[in-house]
From Swiss-Prot:
One of its GO terms (molecular function) is hydroxyacylglutathione hydrolase activity. This is Hydroxyacylglutathione hydrolase. The gene is gloB. Disulfide bonds: none annotated. Belongs to the metallo-beta-lactamase superfamily. Glyoxalase II family. Zn(2+) 2 binds at D58, H59, D134, H172. Signal peptide: none annotated. It is an enzyme of class 3 (hydrolase). It comes from the Bacteria. The keyword Metal-binding applies.
Amino acid sequence: MRIHPVPAFSDNYIWCLTNLESGKTLIVDPGQAKPVLDYLSDSGFSADTILITHHHPDHTGGVKELQQQYPDLRIVGPTDSPFKGATNTVHAGDEVVWEGITFNVLAVPGHTLDHIAYYSDTQVNDKPVLFCGDTLFVCGCGRLFEGTPEQMHTSLQTLRDLPDNTAVYCAHEYTLANLRFARHWLPEDKALAEFENACKDLRERGKPTVPTTIGQEKQLNPFLRWDDAMVIEAAENYSTTHRLATGSDCAVFAAVRHGKDNF
């Protein structure tokens, strides 16, 4: 199996999972068709399944054109969604089977209300796999366009509970921007400073900073560290200044999210 990031727009990644024996390819959140079609053509692969995490156009805009090229495409997307192009709709607890890999569907509302993620404990490249759209990023999380802090905190808890070695394939290259905020929020965190330098080096060489892992995000990502003393202290100081609620894990998360929104 190969997982390949196809760049789209200015900072999207369209993840393509290919069975190298058959050439069959699963595509996650194709916001644009052309870069995917070019990749498939250049590689000699063919698309047979699309996974949609949520309805935003930069995740769904290429579906119709891909379907025109591959009329038998299975298009999997969330139920009760503004996106109406799915041939198969799924919700939390459902399974999607592709080329011997079983993906469990997780409900992760917050960024949008219809947001889902796809997790498989079938190891690809020696790791379980998570396609999480815009819920979790490297050192960040999705902005709350539709959901509440309580919903997003619960969704991130769901992802945080996955095995530490789970490879996290998010949909955007936001890492350096996220790290600028994280370093501002936690200026004494030496691990963040070291990680920022490593990510700058990757980007200077044209390399993606994704995938990350659940374990790495638990150590570094301020949006997952609501029980970390350093993050709690920063959140309480911020909450006092901005008259926000304190005293719970969700309140810590909400303070960090509020801080990022106003950074």
